[in-house]
């Protein structure tokens, strides 16, 4: 893999330094630009004139597939200087109505003795350099943080034919963008980011589809043919493993009081009919469940197991340790007030009182010039000697 012109700042990959050149505008995702600074051995120490604009990338397709217009908005930054650099961080949060409502509820509940905070998983960055020999499929709404705008680098949405392929990534198959050409790209993912190199065609790997950030390939046909959906052997016996009909309801269906066999009440008859109808409905639901699971398994889409895929080499795969789209937010509690009143009162530490004779000294100068020191509690004795 080529060395990128984008430099990671720090060891935790939370920020990147991007070069700004007059001939190459830099596209940075909205909200991710941290600062612009001057650098270099021959720099003047001042940032040159900066021009900032905006650009929409795959607006309509991203709006339909990611249900987000913000994922397509990028700031275009140009400069007249040669040694300016921009600092970029993946400052993107998962905004959604249900998450906003949850944060509102949490803010109300946090008025008690425990503070509750909701945080998204930590995001990291990964610089990528394209040399024109490999295309990259980048999955996720918020994965493209920055890229240089040149005549070669191009970002396109996933084609509909690739999205509908039987061996594609199923529900994740259409939620990616294709990066082609030559240039530098900055990716962002959740958790830590790692790259896996498959050296030849005999190498393969099974990965959870939700952890895939990007996959390289020589064209879309070659890339999608190398991805096999649900590589595990699925047992159809799992389809018959359905919760049994409630035994209590079955007993109700056979309920009949021997003492009142000749005079069953209307309520008892209603209970029997309701139990029989419930049993019939349950059997129908079980039948539909079995047929649905078996049909799904036979067509390569296992709805009862995690969405794993097998990817064949040779290619490079970039993965993230946390899920990009389905990772639930974590709720953590932190004590912001002591639990008891006793804990709220700090312990009083008594400082030992120093004795007076430990710091009051009496000095006597003799006629021969010698000086003697004597510790006394007070000067009463000395005064009495003199007077």
Curated annotation (Swiss-Prot):
InterPro entries: AIM24, AIM24_sf, Trp_RNA-bd_attenuator-like_dom. Keywords: Mitochondrion, Transit peptide. SUPFAM superfamilies: TRAP-like. It is found in: Mitochondrion. Disulfide bonds: none annotated. Belongs to the AIM24 family. This is Altered inheritance of mitochondria protein 24, mitochondrial. It comes from Candida glabrata (strain ATCC 2001 / BCRC 20586 / JCM 3761 / NBRC 0622 / NRRL Y-65 / CBS 138) (Yeast). The gene is AIM24.
């Amino acid at each position: 893999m080529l060395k990128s012109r984008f430099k990671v700042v720090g060891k935790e990959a939370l920020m990147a330094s991007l070069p700004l050149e007059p001939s190459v505008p830099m596209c940075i995702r909205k909200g991710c630009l941290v600062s612009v600074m001057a650098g270099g051995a021959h720099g003047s120490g001042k940032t040159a004139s900066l021009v900032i604009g905006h650009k929409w990338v795959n607006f309509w397709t991203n709006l339909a597939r990611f249900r987000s217009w913000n994922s397509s908005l990028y700031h275009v930054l140009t400069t007249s200087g040669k040694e300016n650099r921009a600092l970029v961080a993946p400052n993107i949060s998962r905004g959604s109505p249900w998450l906003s409502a949850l944060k509102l509820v949490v803010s109300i509940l946090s008025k008690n003795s425990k503070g509750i905070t909701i945080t998204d998983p930590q995001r990291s960055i990964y610089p990528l350099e394209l040399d024109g020999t490999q295309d990259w499929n980048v999955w996720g709404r918020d994965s493209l943080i920055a890229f240089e705008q040149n005549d070669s680098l191009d970002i396109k949405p996933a084609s509909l034919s690739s999205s509908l392929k039987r061996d594609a990534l199923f529900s994740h198959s259409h939620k990616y963008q294709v990066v082609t050409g030559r240039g530098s790209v900055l990716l962002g993912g959740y958790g830590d980011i790692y790259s896996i190199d498959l050296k030849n065609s005999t190498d393969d790997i099974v990965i959870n589809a939700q952890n895939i950030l990007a996959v390289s390939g020589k064209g879309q046909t070659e890339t999608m043919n190398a991805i096999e959906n649900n590589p595990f052997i699925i047992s159809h016996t799992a389809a018959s493993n359905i919760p049994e009909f409630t035994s209590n309801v079955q007993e109700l269906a056979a309920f009949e009081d021997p003492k009142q066999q000749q005079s069953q009440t209307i309520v008892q008859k209603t209970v029997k009919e309701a139990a029989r109808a419930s049993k019939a409905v349950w059997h129908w639901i079980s039948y539909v469940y079995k047929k649905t699971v078996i049909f799904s398994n036979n067509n390569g889409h296992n709805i009862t197991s995690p969405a794993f895929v097998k990817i064949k080499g040779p290619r490079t795969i970039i993965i993230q340790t946390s899920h990009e789209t389905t990772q639930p937010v974590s709720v953590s509690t932190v004590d912001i007030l002591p639990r008891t009143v006793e804990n709220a009162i700090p312990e009083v530490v008594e400082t030992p009182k120093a004795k007076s004779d430990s710091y009051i000294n009496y000095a006597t100068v003799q006629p021969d010039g010698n000086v003697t020191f004597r510790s006394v509690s007070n000067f009463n004795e000395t005064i009495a000697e003199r007077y």
